[in-house]
């Protein structure tokens, strides 16, 4: 019978038996210096059925750390740099999708409430007030646990609980625009309410909507990272929050594994700041009143 002996440098039990720290690379400890090494095999072969033949084939060594870039590996031996790069795409996709859906819902609700007025405005604004009073994070945690862990579910939940602010902003702008002369002229010419909202009110609120769209993106990215850090994100997708969650769960915080902690944290901070600066710049360019105050 043929048997193969395999020693994996990522094996935690192997590190424990060799007295090596969880975050140390065994090759750096076992082969600390350059040069020739002698490998000694000790075995005790006994068989009641006859002689035993032992065959030793060429031994191969693979230095894992040399194959995984500057950020090293995590507890599973996975390349952290690759996870960080892939997580950038996921963060942008989640932030853009959730912000776009939220702005679409908020713009529609705010424009209808502001233009129609009366009981429609009252009902829609009371719904907005109720949702604003609800603590968002606990609700997201409960709903995320109920509907499953997937990127699509996270995007939908983030969008459904982040449109209320833009709805109020668009409503106030619509209340001002519907009293303008060009809107009154459109009403006098027999234009429908839908046509007036789409053709006259929406174009005049687009600068405000676009600026708020950009500012909604970092909020969605940070909220998704928080959910992933709490273990409510998709376990199959290496998001930045998932990287931080793995580092917390498997000792990265206690061992101060900076290559595991700092990159996703800095990525979240820098990307959020970038969108905040872009949003402020867009708001200053498209909003004359904001430019005058600045």
What are these regions (language model features)?
Residues 1-76, 294:
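Membrane-topology segments of multi-pass transport proteins
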Residues 73-294:
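Alpha-helical transmembrane segments of integral membrane proteins
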């Amino acid at each position: 019978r043929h048997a193969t002996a395999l020693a994996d440098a990522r094996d935690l039990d192997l590190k424990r038996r060799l007295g090596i720290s969880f975050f140390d690379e065994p090759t750096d400890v076992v082969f600390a210096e350059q040069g020739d090494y002698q490998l000694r095999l000790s075995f005790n072969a006994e068989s009641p059925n006859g002689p035993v033949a032992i065959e030793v084939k060429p031994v191969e060594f693979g230095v894992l750390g040399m194959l995984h870039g500057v950020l090293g590996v995590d507890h599973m031996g996975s390349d952290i740099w690759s996870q960080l790069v892939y997580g950038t795409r996921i963060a942008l996709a989640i932030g853009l999708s959730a912000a776009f859906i939220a702005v679409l819902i908020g713009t529609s609700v705010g424009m209808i409430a502001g233009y129609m007025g009366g009981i429609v405005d009252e009902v829609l604004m009371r719904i907005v007030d109720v949702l604003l009073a609800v603590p968002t994070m606990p609700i997201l945690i409960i709903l995320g646990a109920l509907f499953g862990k997937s990127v699509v579910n996270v995007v939908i939940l983030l969008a459904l609980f982040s449109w209320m602010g833009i709805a109020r902003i668009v409503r106030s702008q619509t209340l001002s625009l519907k009293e303008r002369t060009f809107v009154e002229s459109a009403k006098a010419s027999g234009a429908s309410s839908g046509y007036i909202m789409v053709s006259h009110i929406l174009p005049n609120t687009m600068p405000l909507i676009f600026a708020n769209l950009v500012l909604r993106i970092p909020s969605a990215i940070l909220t998704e990272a928080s959910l992933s850090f709490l273990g409510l994100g998709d376990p199959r997708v290496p998001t930045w929050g998932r990287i931080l969650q793995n580092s917390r769960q498997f000792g990265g915080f206690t061992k101060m594994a900076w290559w595991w902690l700092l990159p996703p944290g800095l990525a979240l901070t820098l990307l959020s700041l970038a969108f905040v600066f872009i949003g402020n710049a867009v708001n200053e360019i498209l909003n004359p009143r904001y430019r005058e105050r600045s």
